[in-house]
């Protein structure tokens, strides 16, 4: 009722409302603002791991990334265009988007770390999420562990992989954080040092997120911001 009520209020105010996709919940958290400044068009994009909710914002730990990066802005524009067209098959240069490219993108990044480990190169995977239940990604993480990849995970809720099993998950370390605020951010990092690739996302590695929702994982390429997230 609340959603319908506010949608009607916004439409009455002249806003165009996009109602999303049939059978898929839009769970991504993204906002893009375009403005004309001194004769040029500037675009600002905000991508977060948490909801636009003033109550949970006081209780949850999340990340909010605000950028004028044009490639991110182009992907944001493409995302909203596809949302308006109810098109799930969009092409993105930076984003990994569920239900089409998020799971496969994460699995490809895991495969790259497996290849490094097999070539006796440093290989590491860091994941922080609320819950971990996607069977295909679980199997891939177990494969990474067996290959010698160091896997470190911070998981707040459901976790369907057992760390420390001999010859299976020896290289997986899992922790939970209990503090004043609820840990809600999702972070996925692959590699070490300067070669590390890092994404923030609205999605947990759960089948409902990777296959049944519209989600975004956005790369963080600024060195200072990456370092701050990894602290």
Q: Which residue ranges define each predicted feature?
A:
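Gly-rich Lys/Arg/Thr-decorated short loops/hinges at beta-loop-alpha junctions or inter-strand turns
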Residues: 86-95, 120-122
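Structured, non-catalytic alpha/beta "coupling" segments that mediate domain-domain communication
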Residues: 64-65
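PLD/PLD-like phosphodiesterase catalytic module centered on the HKD motif
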Residues: 1-43, 48-51, 56, 71-73, ...
């Amino acid at each position: 009722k609340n959603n319908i009520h506010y949608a009607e209020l916004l439409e009455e105010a002249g806003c165009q409302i996009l109602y999303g996709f049939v059978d898929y919940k839009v769970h991504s958290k993204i906002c893009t603002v375009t403005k004309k400044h001194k004769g040029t068009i500037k675009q600002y994009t905000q991508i977060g791991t948490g909801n636009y909710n003033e109550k949970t914002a006081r209780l949850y730990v999340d990340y909010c990334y605000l950028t004028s990066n044009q490639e991110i802005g182009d992907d944001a524009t493409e995302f909203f265009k596809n949302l308006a067209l109810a098109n799930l098959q969009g092409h993105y240069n930076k984003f990994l988007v569920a239900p089409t490219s998020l799971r496969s993108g994460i699995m490809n990044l895991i495969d790259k770390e497996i290849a490094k480990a097999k070539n006796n190169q440093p290989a590491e995977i860091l994941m922080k999420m609320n819950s971990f239940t996607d069977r295909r990604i679980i199997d891939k993480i177990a494969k990474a562990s067996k290959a010698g990849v160091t896997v470190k995970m911070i998981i707040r809720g459901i976790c369907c992989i057992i760390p420390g099993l001999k010859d299976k998950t020896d290289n997986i370390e899992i922790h939970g954080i209990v503090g004043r605020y609820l840990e809600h951010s999702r972070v996925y990092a692959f590699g070490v040092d300067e070669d590390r690739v890092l994404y923030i996302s609205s999605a947990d590695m759960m089948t409902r997120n990777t296959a049944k929702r519209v989600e975004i994982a956005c790369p963080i390429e600024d060195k200072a911001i990456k370092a701050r997230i990894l602290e």
